[in-house]
Amino acid sequence: MNKRKILVPLGDKSYEVTLEAGILNNISEELLKIGITKKRKILVISNEEISNLYGEKFLNNLKDNKFQAKMFLIKAGESYKNLKTLSEIYDVAFEFGLDRNSIIIALGGGIVGDVSGFAAATWLRGIEYIQIPTTLLSMVDSSVGGKTGVNHPKGKNLIGAFNQPKAVFIDPETLKSLPKREFSAGMAEVIKYGVIRDKELFEYLEIEKNKNELINLKNEYLIKIINSSIKTKSNVVSQDEHENGVRAILNYGHSFGHVIENLCGYGKFLHGEAISIGMNIAGKIAIEKGLWSKEELERQRILLESYDLPTEIPKINKEDVLTILMGDKKVRDGKMRFILPKEIGAVDIYDDVEDSLFLKFFS
């Protein structure tokens, strides 16, 4: 049986991630199992692309099983992850009569999940929500851990809340319709888990046969890497839900990734592609500080590139890099904190990195 359940242990906010091929076809049954009764209204939030693939079937499954469900589609793309979209969700929630006993389901990638989770956190001071991620990146990263929010013109995710979902359902079948580039972008986050905490996963991803089966989207192999990634994330989040300490290691590659996304213009690089370049920069800094070997940096680079991810650092202005980094949420008391690798499978947090040490990598 290929059904996996992973507990995210957070006391009274604990929840399960259920991972199974084809689970989307039995969604009503799964909702009943976790206590979602048919009296509760369900607002499904998705986007047009996902809706065209699964939306109608998903909504019909709920309605055929006598759930009171409505679907609202938000526009796709990072530029729509904003307060205007959030306000549109509130309008629909009001018209549909979403009360405190109602529930929001996020059906889509990371943007759908982030916006839906924040809408749930703030509608009537908080209602329950469920994550059903449909991209590899959202499966292994944003759907687990409770980070929700929208962007502000001054930066990504500046408006948000920690809001844990009631449950997460993952169906690797949805990856079959994912563009190849999006799949590769998701692999950046999987490789990240290998570098920060899971040497065994890193080595599994290096094996040629596994690589081929993953690129060919074989469920058994997908379930293995998604399961490993979520276990690592669950373990870290359960120790530090609000990112006051160890949870920051999940941001390996992200500080420089956000710099690249921001300065190259959102859209030039997918999030995972920017993270891949960010991991390469962090790896180079680790060599400058004598933390890990050139061989390990090279293994990381080769693995990223073998999944069609970029590692070359784009030409961007050094002063702009500093400005963006100082606005990073990981800055504490005016000090930038960097997640740097010590070896494959272990990283640490450093706040003693001189500007000159990383600015040399930017033209």
Swiss-Prot record:
Compartment list: Cytoplasm
Enzyme Commission identifier(s): 4.2.3.4
CDD domains: DHQS
Gene3D superfamilies in the record: 3.40.50.1970, Dehydroquinate synthase-like - alpha domain
Residues that, per the record, bind Zn(2+): E189, H254, H271
Pfam family, one: DHQ_synthase
Catalytic activity: 7-phospho-2-dehydro-3-deoxy-D-arabino-heptonate = 3-dehydroquinate + phosphate
GO BP field: amino acid biosynthetic process; aromatic amino acid family biosynthetic process; chorismate biosynthetic process
NCBIfam families tied to this protein: aroB (TIGR01357)
Identification of the protein by name: 3-dehydroquinate synthase
Organism expressing this protein natively: Prochlorococcus marinus (strain AS9601)
Gene for this chain: aroB
